[in-house]
Every structure is written in structure tokens, then in C-alpha cells.
From Swiss-Prot:
Name of the protein in its database record: Transcription factor elt-1
Residue numbers spanned by region Disordered: 156-211, 319-351
Organism per entry: Caenorhabditis elegans
General function of this protein: Transcriptional activator that binds to the consensus sequence 5'-[AT]GATA[AG]-3' and variations thereof. During embryonic development, required for specification of cell fate of major hypodermal (epidermal) cells at the blastomere stage. The requirement is true for all four lineages derived from ABarp, ABpra and C blastomeres. Required for seam cell maintenance in late embryogenesis, for proper formation of dauer larvae and locomotion. Regulates expression of bro-1, a regulator of seam cell proliferation, via a GATA-like binding motif.
InterPro entries: Transcription_factor_GATA (IPR039355), Znf_GATA (IPR000679), Znf_NHR/GATA (IPR013088)
């Protein structure tokens, strides 16, 4: 058997009908009694022979002897030799000062004893006794140490719970059982919720399909609509008729009403009392209530006098609200070049307007009028502001002259 990477030989010892693992060097009925505990606390280095119920209480016996004065016994070796079992004054620093069951060694020994672990040619045979007394042999050919470390504590097996491949049913703590029950509940509830959601969605689709096949709008008679509504009597209405009824409180008309057209019979014989025209886009009335055309009515409304007859035109003048391509070309010809951009006058326009531009042509300043500018209103970069000299600072105590860089040329702005 491999223990801590070193080979250790064990044999099967029996005592009072039980079986446990014990070292080959010493196997007695007192030392391998199942479920036995060391009742008295022993010093860190055991000075008297004691019973060791489990092989894990010992360290592997090496051939090298190390003699130091670290312990209380001068000249005593600290390694576990083969004569440690039953030999007095050999230290065993693997034997703690408290009870062994505090560290779980005896619990593990009891589990292996109750499970009936036998070692034979690197094969670990585990006989697990079920609640009904049936012995189920479980041969395991894996590493013995890894197998023994997986053995659980000896807990009475519930008859109602079967043996599972992962472990003994019911052999768990309260937290483990609660977590297992919660996990099993989750595993069973998840498919149920999924199935119920799927049934609900499929059932809802089927119900809506079957329930809407025989529906008909009582107003317009359609059978398909994004949303069915009801009128005041509870009858089904399509979405359009339902919304119309909700907003207007009466049934939606089946025929779309035509736009109101002016009756030509009514307007026959009407003429403007001012310019005597019979054609206009809109008839108006003057201050005396007589009908006038749109042009005469607007002129009287703005100027409070009648529109002169000389302003009458043959056709009706309309307003071009959108600039057509022809009009834009005409404006380009009138300007004598490309259209100017807003806020950025060109050289030709600036010369005609009397504005002097710097070399970069980015910013212009009028020579005739001073430029009113305050630092609070115009935030220029701090690198463009500087004083000419110290005398300027003394002379202009409140606000010295400001030098502003406009596109490469320095402009002296006197703010006083």
C-alpha cells in the first residue's frame, strides 16, 4: 500500500467479529478493536506504549536515524523505526495531544472497519452491508490511498433509500441532505417549468388561433386584425373600428368621406368689387362686407386702403417656397461666381463692402468702425493674449491692450 509516496505493508486483523487495517509489525486485539479511541491525552512525544487503532496514526518507518536534542529526551531519534510499536520512549510526533477522534482518524478507521475493507495484491475489496443485511461486494482496483480517502463515515443506512453508485444513500450531513434535496427539487422543477411554459405558449397560440377564426367585426366585417376590441355592447370590433369608436363614440364609417369641394354653382357670378376679377385662390371680404379677391383683400388688410387697379396682373402670382435648380443658377450668375458661404465673405465681396481681410482670408475687420469686444463675451486662447511690456501693465491698470492673433496677423485691440 502506498502512503505518502512510500510503500507500507498491511495485513488484515480481526477482533470481536470486526475487520480493520493494521501494520504488520504489531497486530493485537487491543490495538485494532473497531471503534476504539484513545481515552487519555498523551504528550506530544509519547513516552509510554499506547494502543494505536489506525495505521494513519504512524509515520512510515525509515532506515535513517536522526539524533538531535530538539525533544526533551537527549539522544533520542525522531524517526519512526520498526520497533516503535510496543517499544518504550520512542517518540511518535504523529500522535497528537488531543483525542484522535478530533482529527477524524478513528472515524475513518471505523468507516473502513464497518465497510469491511480488505487488501490483497494491490486490490481493495469493499463489502458494503445494506440495511436489509445483504452484502454487496465492490472490488476496486484503483489506488488504495485514493480509495480509502473516499470512504465516508459509518452512518446507519436507511432501508427506504437504495444504494447509489455515487455513495451510500442517506449518508450525509444535514447541510448535505438539504443541498441534495434542493438540487433534486431544482432538477425536477426545471423541466416542469419548461414544459409548463412550452404548453402555455403553444396552448396560448392554439387558443388564440381557434378563438379568432370565427370572430368578425360587427362594423366592417373583417376577420383578421392585429387586436380585437369591443364596443359598448360587448360586440367584437377590429382594431381600426375599435379605436375610431373609442375616440369618436360612434361607429366608424365604412366609406371614406371625400374632401369637401366648393360648389361651382355658388361661386358663379362673383367678382372682386375692387379689381373686377373672377379668378382667385381665396375669396375675402372688405370692411363693408363685399367680396374681394385674395390680393385685394390682403392689400386692404395691410394698408387699410383699397388696392390700386394698376397693380392688377393678368395671372395669379404664386410664391416659390422651395428654391429650384433654375433659381439657384440665376442667383449664381447675379453674384458673379460661386455662392458665398454664410459668415465667411470672399475677397471680392469684402473689397466691395469695405472690409479688410488678413492674408489668410479667415477673419475680417472693418477699418472705419472699432471692434467692440470684451474678454467675457469672446473667449480667445490664452496663448494669444500678452502684454507688450511692464510699462503697459502699469499704464493700463484695469485692462491693458490685448493682442489677438487673427489668422496670422496680430491685431491690437484697445478696450479702453
Amino acid at each position: 500500500m502506498d502512503y505518502e509516496g512510500k510503500p507500507v505493508e498491511f495485513t488484515l486483523g480481526t477482533s470481536s467479529g470486526g475487520a480493520s487495517l493494521a501494520p504488520t509489525s504489531s497486530t493485537t486485539a487491543a490495538s485494532i478493536a473497531p471503534f476504539s479511541y484513545n481515552t487519555s491525552a498523551t504528550n506530544y512525544y509519547n513516552t509510554t506504549p499506547s494502543s494505536y487503532p489506525m495505521f494513519l496514526n504512524y509515520q512510515y518507518a525509515g532506515g535513517t536515524t536522526v539524533t538531535t536534542d530538539m525533544d526533551a529526551f537527549s539522544g533520542m531519534d525522531m524517526s519512526m523505526n520498526n520497533g516503535v510499536f510496543g517499544t518504550q520512549n520512542n517518540p511518535s510526533y504523529f500522535y497528537p495531544t488531543t483525542q484522535l477522534n478530533t482529527y477524524g482518524y478513528d472515524t475513518l478507521a471505523a468507516a473502513t472497519t464497518a465497510s469491511g475493507i480488505t487488501v490483497n495484491n494491490n486490490q481493495l475489496n469493499v463489502n458494503i452491508v445494506q440495511g436489509n443485511g445483504t452484502i454487496v461486494p465492490q472490488p476496486i482496483t484503483q489506488n488504495i490511498i485514493s480509495t480509502v480517502s473516499n470512504v465516508q463515515s459509518s452512518v446507519p443506512i436507511n432501508n427506504s433509500q437504495p444504494l447509489t453508485p455515487t455513495g451510500l444513500a442517506g449518508c450525509s450531513t444535514s447541510s448535505g441532505s438539504s443541498s441534495a434535496s434542493s438540487s433534486s427539487a431544482n432538477s425536477t422543477s426545471t423541466p416542469k417549468n419548461t414544459i409548463s411554459k412550452a404548453n402555455r405558449s403553444s396552448g396560448g397560440a392554439n387558443n388564440s388561433q381557434f378563438s379568432t377564426e370565427d370572430r368578425e367585426c360587427v362594423n366592417c366585417g373583417v376577420h383578421n386584425t392585429p387586436l380585437w376590441r369591443r364596443d359598448g355592447s360587448g360586440n367584437y370590433l377590429c382594431n381600426a373600428c375599435g379605436l375610431y369608436f373609442k375616440m369618436n363614440h360612434h361607429a366608424r364609417p365604412l366609406v371614406k368621406p371625400k374632401k369637401r369641394q366648393q360648389n361651382a354653382q355658388k361661386r358663379t357670378g362673383i367678382e372682386c368689387v375692387n379689381c373686377r376679377t373672377n379668378t382667385t385662390t381665396l375669396w375675402r371680404r372688405n370692411g363693408e362686407g363685399h367680396p374681394v379677391c385674395n390680393a385685394c383683400g390682403l392689400y386692404f388688410k395691410l394698408h387699410k386702403v383699397e388696392r390700386p387697379i394698376t397693380m392688377k396682373k393678368d395671372g395669379i402670382q404664386t410664391r416659390n417656397r422651395k428654391l429650384s435648380a433654375k433659381g439657384s443658377r440665376r442667383m449664381k450668375k447675379e453674384n458673379g461666381g460661386t455662392p458665398t458661404s454664410m459668415g465667411m465673405p470672399t475677397t471680392s465681396s469684402s473689397i466691395s463692402s469695405g472690409i479688410e481681410l488678413d492674408q489668410s482670408g479667415v477673419w475680417g475687420m472693418k477699418n472705419t468702425q472699432p471692434m467692440l469686444m470684451t474678454p467675457t463675451a469672446y473667449a480667445f486662447p490664452a496663448s494669444n493674449f500678452y502684454f507688450n511690456s511692464i510699462e503697459d501693465q502699469l499704464e493700463y491698470k484695469t485692462c491693458p491692450p490685448m493682442m489677438v492673433d487673427f489668422g496670422g496677423q496680430m491685431k491690437n485691440l484697445n478696450l479702453n
